């Protein structure tokens, strides 16, 4: 949203206590008047009136009332159960009850609260009951009758108690819906008057007071409003201006304990809780919520600078990782679970919202006894905690693509200040379920393609490994073939050398002192000697017909035979090794 002062909303001063308020304070019982005055005095000490933005100012004041009366410790489900225990669910909405019965209701609420808390955390029930009752009377009993309507009590307590805003709105709709499940416009007008009485009670009537204009800002008189449309209107961005403080009140409760380990550049506090604001123009310039709301600055920073609101803290490393992750995403996420930034008035329902009317409501038992049942029944429209994505403050735009929205907002606030009642209702409130289905289908297809690519990569990697093994086996085979060829050549050389020696033995002259042929012919021979052929036969014949000295020739022949034997043994070993390698590859599946 674009605001005229660049850094926040129009400065709308809170109203001081009016004369009517003082007359009402004097007309109520003294005890109630004193307790109400005590609340007002303590609220003034918090200096909420110095907050520049009316929305934040109203939310801060009501948050103070919540914490002071301890009603923020009671959730919506226990509050509804207290209504049932005291029989308020069986009474018509405009039934008037006495102050004593309202006090009995508050007694039930806070006594049940102490039963759920440990002893060290018990609240002072008397103080809480008296303060809350005084606030209710100050807000709704303007005529000093000492009575309150059932509807005003339900609206006030359901608004101020703890719990999710969507659950509270469902309960409120159950109170203002007809038997067909559609909103009754007369009851809605009454509801709006009751809830805006809370902001009027904390002196924010100039901005958030009830008027016919406020009713027209929400719905047209002839519009059929179902539960989904009702929720979508109050949880949309932006919601109707008269009720903008309501979602902010719940977001304040959710970030009240969020810790930011950074230094505020205005007040120099080393760390703080709540919201954190970062300037989009000044380098690493950050402010705590108190300084930003009240316009405190330092250095060259100006309130005209654009600011972003953060509800949690991320270290620079996490921010970098998150930015890289978002840049690599093919499809934008529809919801962010852990994001740290929020739109100041953004509340989204966790699922597509249908514009069809909800089924008729049973007003006698509209709210289930347990939260689990109602969450199951409304799973399509239940909302999670407030989103935490970084966005601009109301009136700020970080991108040039929303200029049209900025002009619309300027026109809206100009019309509001000039007193016109026209409020352009937002169109396209429900999400397109077909688009969601298409996105899911596309995601499934991409996941399937990714799985196929992973399987194909694994197959190619396995094939590459197999090819490498086959190439190594081929190289080994070539090496063995080369060795076999070399050994065969060596064998041929040795055989030629042996034949040459045999030829010398057969053709050489006989020594003078040698053995006679007759003596050699008389040497005994075995059967194996007679079977010698080839070289062995030549050797045998050489010994029988000795022509050279026997000792020399025998040594040469034995040496040649040893070399042939060694060469053949090496050849056999190499062949056996090659055969074992081939068998191993076959076993491994190559």
Swiss-Prot record:
Domain of life, per lineage: Eukaryota
Recorded coiled-coil stretches: 434-508
Expression by tissue: From late embryogenesis to adulthood, expressed in neurons and muscles; particularly strong in the ventral nerve cord and in muscles of the body wall, head pharyngeal, and vulva; weaker in the intestinal muscle (at protein level).
Zn finger (ZZ-type) start-end: 259-315
Signal peptide as annotated in the record: none
GO BP annotation list: acetylcholine transport; establishment of synaptic specificity at neuromuscular junction; locomotory behavior; muscle cell cellular homeostasis; positive regulation of locomotion; positive regulation of synaptic transmission, cholinergic; sarcomere organization; synaptic signaling
Annotated segments matching region Essential for interaction with dys-1: 484-490
Chain ranges passing through the membrane: none
Protein name as it appears in the record: Dystrobrevin-1
Species this chain originates from: Caenorhabditis elegans
Gene assigned in the entry: dyb-1
